[in-house]
Swiss-Prot record:
Pfam families: GatC (PF02686). Allows the formation of correctly charged Asn-tRNA(Asn) or Gln-tRNA(Gln) through the transamidation of misacylated Asp-tRNA(Asn) or Glu-tRNA(Gln) in organisms which lack either or both of asparaginyl-tRNA or glutaminyl-tRNA synthetases. The reaction takes place in the presence of glutamine and ATP through an activated phospho-Asp-tRNA(Asn) or phospho-Glu-tRNA(Gln). This is Aspartyl/glutamyl-tRNA(Asn/Gln) amidotransferase subunit C. SUPFAM superfamilies: Glu-tRNAGln amidotransferase C subunit. Keywords: ATP-binding, Ligase, Nucleotide-binding, Protein biosynthesis. Heterotrimer of A, B and C subunits. It catalyses: L-glutamyl-tRNA(Gln) + L-glutamine + ATP + H2O = L-glutaminyl-tRNA(Gln) + L-glutamate + ADP + phosphate + H(+); L-aspartyl-tRNA(Asn) + L-glutamine + ATP + H2O = L-asparaginyl-tRNA(Asn) + L-glutamate + ADP + phosphate + 2 H(+). GO terms for molecular function: asparaginyl-tRNA synthase (glutamine-hydrolyzing) activity; ATP binding; glutaminyl-tRNA synthase (glutamine-hydrolyzing) activity. It comes from Cyanothece sp. (strain PCC 7425 / ATCC 29141). The keyword DNA-binding does not apply. One of its GO terms (biological process) is translation. Belongs to the GatC family. The gene is gatC. Its EC number is 6.3.5.-.
Amino acid sequence: MLNEEQVKKVAHLARLELSGEEVAQFTTQLGSILDYFQQLEELNVTDVPPTTRAIESSNITRADQLHPWAERENILAIAPEQDGDFFRVPKIISTED
């Protein structure tokens, strides 16, 4: 069973700040989800072929196309900070655990 310390650790790794009420709520909810996965592990699927989808589908994506954008320089000009052709943004992820 999942405990509150595990939920706090996952929240910390995901850079989420949870209140005590949210920790309790997510402990219950995530515990239910993990219990469901435990039930799925008990199913006999030896004769079921591996699949990635329940319904077969063909490739529905399109090829990427590069188009020049006339407003590019205008957008870069109003950026608070830029570095050449890139926006400069504050660092938000640290390497601390």
